[in-house]
Amino acid sequence: IQGSKYIDLRLECMKQLEKIGYNGFIIANGDALLTNPRELVEVVTSLKKESKKSSYFIFSFAELSFMPILTYMGIDGFLADSANYYSHLNVLQTPTKAYDLNTYPIYDDITQKELEEKNIENMEFTIKEIHAHMKNNSLRNLVEERSGTTPQNISTLKILDKTQMDYLLEYTKLF
């Protein structure tokens, strides 16, 4: 769903696609949204509120530490290609942090392919962790735990709690 920072364009794009039978949507510019917590919250919650119940949303290029809060907000899936994307940037994705290996040389002589495999493995773990917390009705706990990993993550949670409490009560289990 394109539209940049213009939420009304994203909503119109989604509604027109729903009219012609689409129900799966990839939110464009995911990596840019992660750096702007207010816009991230506005885009995701607006799309979820205005979509049909049968629609699902996929977030592109999500950092692993953001996956719990994105799921909590209503994102239904993530692109596995983000592991490849971040490996080309020489970034190791872990459940709590994204490490630029040029700055943090955690692994010596790791190839891009090996880095992609590690990123996929960590993504699979993060998804399993999210599923386990969902089954145990403790996703909010995981969200709060991960919110401390980056300033953008904690800002996203604070903005979500402050501006979208009605949305959270309607669409999520708080604990």
Regions found by a protein language model. Name each.
Residues I1-E114:
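Glycine-rich phosphate/ribose-binding loops and adjacent secondary-structure elements
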Residues I106-F175:
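C-terminal extensions of enzymes
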